[in-house]
Amino acid sequence: MSTINTGINGFRSHWPYCLACSLENPKVKVVAINDPFIDLEYMVYMFKYDSTHGRFKGTVEHKDGKLVVNGHEIAVHAERDPAQIPWGSHGADYVIESTGVFTTKDAASAHLKGGAKKVIISAPSADAPMFVVGVNLDKYTSDLTVISNASCTTNCLAPLAKVIHDNYGILEGLMTTVHATTATQKTVDGPSNKDWRGGRGAGANIIPSSTGAAKAVGKVIPELNGKLTGMAFRVPTPDVSVVDLTVRLEKPASYDEIKATIKKASESEELKGILGYTEDQVVSTDFVGDAHSSIFDAKAGIQLSPTFVKLISWYDNEFGYSTRVVDLLAYVAGKDGAL
């Protein structure tokens, strides 16, 4: 089987998980990593130990200036300017842009100067086309050189919203994500001029925050453009988040009918492994390490009337999202004829 030679720019946040996910996907081979702020020895440490997901079960070391994972050597660079990263010299045709800095088409296109042929941004983008696995991959065309995998929350919300809209029609809706702490937050109160609440201590507060995840669904499902918006609450847990989608339906349905529809969709070829379904009495830690984008919690939702319903879906905002980035990469490469 042929493999996709891949580069990663930014070895922080969820990217140790993405590298781990790539090891499980025989179609993807990471050949180079760039991060100007992390030295090689620390990179080994970050990959080996994780407070939430535990120790890496394989082998990781550094040798001759390279990161070696399960015996596989990965070149490491420390360039600040994406245009200076020599992706081409490593045969890395595809690059995952994960710094959270170069999120526009223009900024991410700098990787093309170093020899990359395609860039996948692991964050929402203001102008790059966004794709969500299981939702709108049919819209991808090979002429696109910079694309976005949207956000972890959009990846949770969009599959659920698509199933509901396709079967019952969504007239309008509000989304709230109860979101685990992320590395951008403050451990204790500190300066945050643009977001005063965001400057408060993450471990001591439930923090209301903004999110563009619901509006972004309108970009991947155009029929829902302008019909959804939302907000977030940041909570002091290390991983796993949950979406609360409250919608007004066009077609009346009982909650049991809605559950059955979602369960059937979760077993379909299109959404199997993407949208999960559970009737267990679960809590957030039950989903640590879950690779689904979205796991519908049938016991947590409620209904006020046949056209007004609240739906709940969980997601591992680290591991689940990282898995989807690798899946998107493999899909795109297949469509490009690289596999």
Curated annotation (Swiss-Prot):
Keyword annotations from UniProtKB, A to Z: Cytoplasm, Glycolysis, NAD, Oxidoreductase
Location (main, coarse): cytoplasm
Pathway participation: Carbohydrate degradation; glycolysis; pyruvate from D-glyceraldehyde 3-phosphate: step 1/5
Keyword set includes Transferase: no
UniProt xrefs under InterPro entries: GlycerAld/Erythrose_P_DH, GlycerAld_3-P_DH_AS, GlycerAld_3-P_DH_cat, GlycerAld_3-P_DH_NAD(P)-bd, Glyceraldehyde-3-P_DH_1, NAD(P)-bd_dom_sf
Amino acids binding NAD(+): 13-14, 35, 80, 317
Keyword Transcription: no
Source species, domain of life: Eukaryota
Gene Ontology biological process terms from the UniProt entry: glucose metabolic process; glycolytic process
Cross-referenced PANTHER family: GLYCERALDEHYDE 3-PHOSPHATE DEHYDROGENASE, GLYCERALDEHYDE-3-PHOSPHATE DEHYDROGENASE-RELATED
Name of the protein described by the UniProt record: Glyceraldehyde-3-phosphate dehydrogenase 3
